[in-house]
Amino acid sequence: MHRTTRIKITELNPHLMCVLCGGYFIDAATIIECLHSFCKTCIVRYLETSKYCPICDVQVHKTRPLLNIRADKTLQDIVYKLVPGLFKGEMKRRRDFYAAHPSVDAANGSNEDRGEVADEDKRIITDDEIISLSIEFFDQNRANRKGSKDKEKSKDEANDKRYLRCPAALTIMHLRKFLRSKMDIPSNFQIDVMYEEEPLKDYYTLMDIAYIYTWRRNGPLPLKYRVRPTCKRVKINPHTDRINNTSGDMESDSGSDKAGSLGGGIPSTSSCMPRPPVQSPHPHFPHISSTINGTNSSSSHQNPFANRARKISLNGVSAISSG
């Protein structure tokens, strides 16, 4: 089964770092002519003295290069999500800057420009962050009755849910081991952790699940689990299989011999046992019929009873001879 390959952040650095300052993108901006990206402040400062791309030397604009620069929010969100602590550190630097320079007018800027956006509002999750989750047993019958009213739920169903606080780097494999040890589930049963009705991979982390299913922190991360028997694999003994194949071949050979003997009375030469020589029906004229390789053949001598046709066979091929 195909598995997602995890790569190191250092392998992605060439796509996440600005060539002008050597750091990760902050307020990423892209040149629409060549699609190369830089930090906004870096490219604006560079284009004050040049009208060409720093990477490929394509002309950005003849007179006003800033017109062909666009803010790349998607790229910036990717950088913030891939680099741990970058968003939180950048927001802190902006707050410190405006606190140290109160004369700077930031009223026209957004909350992110002023550094007043929290990780929760930006939906940025770090590895060391604590995530609240709920885990409950997945009942297929209850899922089929999903259209019923909420008031029909019993107190037992509400008490089935448990709440945990776990690091964002916790994997589903660790959560399955926790459930097995907590509930004493035997090893011959399989535990599946699910989001809604979809089973989750063992290598998924809570951070992966939050990003994949767009968890918005409006409550604990809802997870479910189910327990099912482990499927046993039947092992085939190669020695037994070889014996069965050999016996099948022998049966097919014997069947072909029987079919040959019934189809027209032609003696078969494929049998492993030699057939006895066929004696001449005329003991006084032994030259009429002779045996070659267990089959009958006619002699070249003249037969006194030539007026009667006889049937002979040579090497399993029948023929009618008139003598």
UniProtKB/Swiss-Prot annotation:
GO terms for cellular component: PcG protein complex; PRC1 complex. The lineage of its organism: Eukaryota, Metazoa, Chordata, Craniata, Vertebrata. GO terms for biological process: negative regulation of gene expression, epigenetic; negative regulation of transcription by RNA polymerase II. It comes from Xenopus laevis. PROSITE patterns: ZF_RING_1, ZF_RING_2. This is Polycomb complex protein BMI-1-B. Residues 238-310 are annotated as: Disordered. GO terms for molecular function: promoter-specific chromatin binding; zinc ion binding. Transmembrane segments: none annotated. Component of a Polycomb group (PcG) multiprotein PRC1-like complex, a complex class required to maintain the transcriptionally repressive state of many genes, including Hox genes, throughout development. PcG PRC1 complex acts via chromatin remodeling and modification of histones; it mediates monoubiquitination of histone H2A 'Lys-119', rendering chromatin heritably changed in its expressibility. In the PRC1 complex, it is required to stimulate the E3 ubiquitin-protein ligase activity of rnf2. Pfam families: RAWUL, zf-C3HC4_2. Its main location: nucleus. It is found in: Nucleus. Signal peptide: none annotated. A motif (Nuclear localization signal) lies at residues 81-95. A zinc finger (RING-type) spans 18-57. Residues 287-301 have a biased composition (Low complexity). Component of a PRC1-like complex. Interacts with cbx4. Keywords: Chromatin regulator, Metal-binding, Nucleus, Repressor, Transcription, Transcription regulation, Zinc, Zinc-finger.
